[in-house]
């Protein structure tokens, strides 16, 4: 009996049990979170257990060390060294394989001229034409069944000028080498193409060039390996559809990691990055974008190096891609379901997939069926007189307390914006914790205050039913979003899971009421009618929250008394119904005077209830013990809390550093934090009003700590630095001054840092800082001259880039006024790989340029003759981007054709000055090497000393990246 008594005591709905269960729940969630984030580090292959995998990892790590020895952007000579190393490794791996072929774009001098929308800004209406000379390395492994649609594996080997490219994208490249080595030993069934591509960073150009290769016709599927962060785990960033998501599910059995929340966030442009996957997808391929995604404040900086990553991260990407490629290469694929997919993993152990369209259909079923069932059960309970009527004060306290919590949260967010808007960049846990504790603490205070003055003995059940109504409304809204987005809002699935579990809990309560015994209820009402002169507390409903009327034989009566007595001390109410009595939710009775026997009158001082009971009822013990609350708790709290916490963590982990990219991103992150914390609070709100004083005290303490950390702690540290963008601009039309541009977030961060630089501090150099769009600040000052070239004389920066007009017939008398104007330019640019020409007419709203010609010098052509590539555009061309491989080729030869104003608007007007058809051409050329030296007059000097100074003297709470495709930009302008 004692064991039974203890068991019943543990299951009682009381403060201690509830608080303990909450503690256990959140402890388990914390342990699962830690397990999820640390487990992959312990799964490295061991030489004695998996010798082949261990060899692949060790070889890949060695390759990564060599590739990331220096910065290697497309605009650098080191880029060629990486290309040559990869080509050597590819030839070593393929050897004399009978089914392997290698193609080197650099050797074949492959180039493309094509019109391209800005891949990093889909809203841009700027018409761009790009000329690109490729050095992609492609490998073809012909499959045993070459008629099957092939698989492309792709990664880019260029880095940005300011990063070593360990994760972006060195790990992807060496993972491709490992995959190549594996599939050489295990010949695939379908044909595999490996694309080690170049110049992803400045236009996704290597991927674009792939479709100029004949092998592109062999592939239908793609695995793209990328790095948009700087380590951690490689996530399934996005995938084409439900079929490809299920292929990932079937193939990646060990450490799967993916979430369609990332996919929705990426397509919604909350992340200002793009990968080669975009190009492959636009060209009709289906597949998987696997990428590192955090931390973004180290992404594209000097800390994207092998020192800041690990073998565990490399193995996670390598093993994921290997599992996926091996499955696709060797199995028939079911690719019928091409609807967008909702998917997620459970702590790296299990991967779940559902079609977004199927989820929408289930949402519709839930939305239709759940209110019908709920209303039906309500009507049954009303008809059977088991429904307990409640005042409007009881019904409104839960939603009003939630609304009050949201208002308090909004007020606190205003304080964050005023005092520390970038706090999310350092640690998003503290603001999320502050928002979360505000909501639950406010709800606790308001509900218990209202219960003090207007007691409600069924608060939990009312709250669960109202939570069901709130979630029904939310699900209706999100389902509409899912439908209107053509099922691309794939990150909304957590709300469907939450709604389903909460609905089950609410319906269980309604079902208990509908099936409950009526006799007790009727007699209780009769007694209340006979004793209406008693105090107001006697009108309280005698059933406690969630109680069931259970008939038990008389021989259990004594044990029931013992059970009740054993827990008497804990059966007090969460609130008092006045100074003289307490309402006990567990019993629905005045606990100060109750006896643990059903024969005691339900109304204080009255024996009429006992007199009114029938002989049968007198022989039965009706036990008012609520054990159903545990089922409700387990349905509503643990699983939804874990899923919602994980979803919020996924969002914040990917976006928290984007607050450095502008005020819009800051408000987005703040909004996600607020909404996410509300969703995290919803599962526990129906229960939280009943926690004990220790729990609520800890909640208040956690809020105070979180609020102080959020508002008072500096947002940037050595490990979480502020990322600043650098460029040095030399405008030859304005002189030779080398103006340094430093771009970063507003907030008095940049100028104090710059004022402490030696070249500024000791020369009184003026720093001009101005606010630019989107909450960013641009600081400019005259910096030290760059040394881009080795020379034996004085460096003349104006000799770095010159423009020669070879031909221009604008003012030719032989040209008809209706005839397009033609000009030829020769750009003389030394040791350069990238330039941009921008076209503008002062007299025409749109660019009048309709045709661009690029004259190439082909080394393989007879006597290195020129070969032309021409592109036309009826809508006009605003910009021409030029990318060439040969540093020794010092010229770009360009032809431009544009329409006179007469052709574009048909207005024949006098042009006495002869300027209406003028075309302004702005030229910008880029140099991206800084971690190297030039020899000037026999002395070794650093190429970009202004950038070196920032790296050497700025506090460690700053990190630096390039503002444009080069660190030094030489500009000029002419009028044609």
UniProtKB/Swiss-Prot annotation:
Feature: compositional bias, Polar residues: 549-558
Record field: transmembrane: 16-36, 360-380, 393-412, 429-449, 462-482, 497-517, 628-648, 669-689, 693-713
Active site, renumbered: 200
An individual GO BP term: proteolysis
Glycosylation sites: 96, 121, 189, 212, 217, 656, 768, 796, 811, 866, 937
Residues marked Transition state stabilizer (site): 299
InterPro entries xrefs: Fxna-like_M28_dom (IPR048024), M28_fam (IPR045175), Peptidase_M28 (IPR007484), PFF1_C (IPR053975), PFF1_TM (IPR053976)
Compositionally skewed regions (Low complexity) per UniProt: 559-570
Membrane-protein topology: Multi-pass membrane protein
Enzyme Commission designation: 3.4.-.-
UniProt protein name: Vacuolar membrane protease
Organism of origin: Saccharomyces cerevisiae (strain RM11-1a) (Baker's yeast)
């Amino acid at each position: 009996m004692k064991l039974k008594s203890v068991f019943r005591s543990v299951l009682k709905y009381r403060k201690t049990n509830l608080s303990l269960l909450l503690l256990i729940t959140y402890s388990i969630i914390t342990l699962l979170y830690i397990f999820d984030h640390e487990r992959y580090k312990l799964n490295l292959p061991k030489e004695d257990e998996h010798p082949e995998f261990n060899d692949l990892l060790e070889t890949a790590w060695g390759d990564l060390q060599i590739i990331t020895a220096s910065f290697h952007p497309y605009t650098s000579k080191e880029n060629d060294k990486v290309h040559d190393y990869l080509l050597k490794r590819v030839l070593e791996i393929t050897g004399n394989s009978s089914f392997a072929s290698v193609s080197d774009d650099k050797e074949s001098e492959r180039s493309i001229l094509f019109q391209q929308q800005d891949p990093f800004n889909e809203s841009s209406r700027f018409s761009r034409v790009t000329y690109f000379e490729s050095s992609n390395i492609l490998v073809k492994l012909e499959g045993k069944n070459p008629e099957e649609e092939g698989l492309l594996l792709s990664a880019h080997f260029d880095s940005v000028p300011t990063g070593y490219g360990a994760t972006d994208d060195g790990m992807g490249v060496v993972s491709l080498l490992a995959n190549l080595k594996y599939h050489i030993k295990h010949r695939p069934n379908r044909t595999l193409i490996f694309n080690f591509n170049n110049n992803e960073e400045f236009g996704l150009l290597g991927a674009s060039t792939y479709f100029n290769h004949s092998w592109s016709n062999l592939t239908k599927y793609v695995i793209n390996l990328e790095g948009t962060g700087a380590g951690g785990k490689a996530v399934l960033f996005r995938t084409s559809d439900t079929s490809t998501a299920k292929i990932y599910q079937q193939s990646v059995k060990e450490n799967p990691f993916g979430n369609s929340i990332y996919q929705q966030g990426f397509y919604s442009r909350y992340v200002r990055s793009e990968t080669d996957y975009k190009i492959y997808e636009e060209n009709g391929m289906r597949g998987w974008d696997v990428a590192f995604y955090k931390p973004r404040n180290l992404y594209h900086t000097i800390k994207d190096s092998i020192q800041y990553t690990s073998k565990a991260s490399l193995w996670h990407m390598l093993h994921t891609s290997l599992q996926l490629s091996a499955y696709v290469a060797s199995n028939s694929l079911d690719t019928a379901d091409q609807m967008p997919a909702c998917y997620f993993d459970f702590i790296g152990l299990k991967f779940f997939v559902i079609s977004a369209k199927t989820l929408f259909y289930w949402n519709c079923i839930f939305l239709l069926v759940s209110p019908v069932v709920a209303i039906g059960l309500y009507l049954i309970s009303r008809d059977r007189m088991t429904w307990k009527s409640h005042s409007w004060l009881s019904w409104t306290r839960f939603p009003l307390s939630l609304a009050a919590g949201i208002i308090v949260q909004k007020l606190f967010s205003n304080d964050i914006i005023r005092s520390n808007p970038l706090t999310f960049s350092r640690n998003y846990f503290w603001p999320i914790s502050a928002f979360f504790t505000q909501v639950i603490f406010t709800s606790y205070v308001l509900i218990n205050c209202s219960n003090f003055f207007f007691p409600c003995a069924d608060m939990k059940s009312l709250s669960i039913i109202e939570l069901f109504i709130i979630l029904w409304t939310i699900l209706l809204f999100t389902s509409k979003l899912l439908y209107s987005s053509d099922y691309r809002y794939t990150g909304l699935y957590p709300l469907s899971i939450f709604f389903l579990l909460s609905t089950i809990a609410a319906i269980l309560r309604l079902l208990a009421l509908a099936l409950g015994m009526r006799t007790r209820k009727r007699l209780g009402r009769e007694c209340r009618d006979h004793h209406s002169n008693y105090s107001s507390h006697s009108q309280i409903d005698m059933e406690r929250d969630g109680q069931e009327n259970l008939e038990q034989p008389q021989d259990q009566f004594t044990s029931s008394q013992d059970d009740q007595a054993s827990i008497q001390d804990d059966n007090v109410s969460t609130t008092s119904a006045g100074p003289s009595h307490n309402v006990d939710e567990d019993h629905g009775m005045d606990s100060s005077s109750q006896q643990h026997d059903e024969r005691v009158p339900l109304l204080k001082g009255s024996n009429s209830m006992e007199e009114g009971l029938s002989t049968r009822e007198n022989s039965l013990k009706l036990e008012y013990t609520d054990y159903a609350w545990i089922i409700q708790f387990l349905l509503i709290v643990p699983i939804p809390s874990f899923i919602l916490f994980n979803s919020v963590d996924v969002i914040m982990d990917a976006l928290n550093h984007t607050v450095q990219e502008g005020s819009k991103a800051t408000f987005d992150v703040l909004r996600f934090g607020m909404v996410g914390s509300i969703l995290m609070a919803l599962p526990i709100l129906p229960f939280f009003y009943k926690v004990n004083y220790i729990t609520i005290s800890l909640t208040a303490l956690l809020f105070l700590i979180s609020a102080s950390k959020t508002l008072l702690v500096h947002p940037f540290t050595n490990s979480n630095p502020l990322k600043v963008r650098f460029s040095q601009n030399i405008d030859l039309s304005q002189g030779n001054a080398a103006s340094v541009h430093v771009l970063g977030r507003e907030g008095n961060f940049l100028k104090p840092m710059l004022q402490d630089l030696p070249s500024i501090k000791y020369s009184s150099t003026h720093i001009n800082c101005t606010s630019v769009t989107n909450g960013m600040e641009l600081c400019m000052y005259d910096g030290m001259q760059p040394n881009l070239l080795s020379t034996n004389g004085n460096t003349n920066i104006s000799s770095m880039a010159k423009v020669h007009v070879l031909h221009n017939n604008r003012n030719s008398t032989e040209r008809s006024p209706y005839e397009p104007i033609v000009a030829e330019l020769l750009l003389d640019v030394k040791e350069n790989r990238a330039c941009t020409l921008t076209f503008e007419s002062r007299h025409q709203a749109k660019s009048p340029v309709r045709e661009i010609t690029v004259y190439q010098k082909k080394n393989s052509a007879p006597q290195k003759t020129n070969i032309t590539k021409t592109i036309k555009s009826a809508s006009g061309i605003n910009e021409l981007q030029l990318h060439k491989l040969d540093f020794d080729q010092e010229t770009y030869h360009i032809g431009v054709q544009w329409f006179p104003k007469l052709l574009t608007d048909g207005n024949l007007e006098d042009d006495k000055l002869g300027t209406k058809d003028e075309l302004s051409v702005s030229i910008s050329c880029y140099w991206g090497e800084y971690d190297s030296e030039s020899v000037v007059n026999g002395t070794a000097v650093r190429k970009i000393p202004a950038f070196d100074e920032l790296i050497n003297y700025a506090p460690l709470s700053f990190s630096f990246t390039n503002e444009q495709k080069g660190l030094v930009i030489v500009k000029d302008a002419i009028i044609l």
